[in-house]
């Protein structure tokens, strides 16, 4: 089982606490030469890394891309984002004006939790069906093409969309004391533009492992166990109960 992420450059194993660099090819080669039937598990795998493993005749499964893991991870991500906001926001979240960009896994749980804390929440989304869900959850739906009002009144902005949405044009609409928290894997907020306008901006990545490492580990463990139980059903010589007992 490889770490999360398995690699950042498709060449070396991601092992920041280990002094030496370990190439993925050296690992794949050693496993391939062992002659054993091995199931490899990794996280955030690129197509290039999966192809490289296949070149060595190995099966490499991405445990991070499973929908149930992504949904479960959205909970500690939400808690971490709110903790970050509370640390830097000089007011209570109760009655605060929050804007959430995107209504995917994180956007859904984040907007719901902010609303439960008493915040006034606008959610910027694209789909008409999302607007109905946002409204049913007690938040205000805003279309992406008509979101100026959601920016001009915003005190806390949370981005969940991995695409550059907040540029110089949008920054002019935001209050100078608005706090911006970017939760997307690829930046959705122009940090330099935000700093020029005097706004605090935080690119908050890998929050589950930072704010709730035990929970993050359990989420990965549960999904890995499900993969193993699927790959090695009870009729297999290594049954699911043996796998659970060993762990």
List the model feature ranges, each with a label.
Residues 5, 22-39, 134-210:
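Rossmann-like adenosine-cofactor binding region
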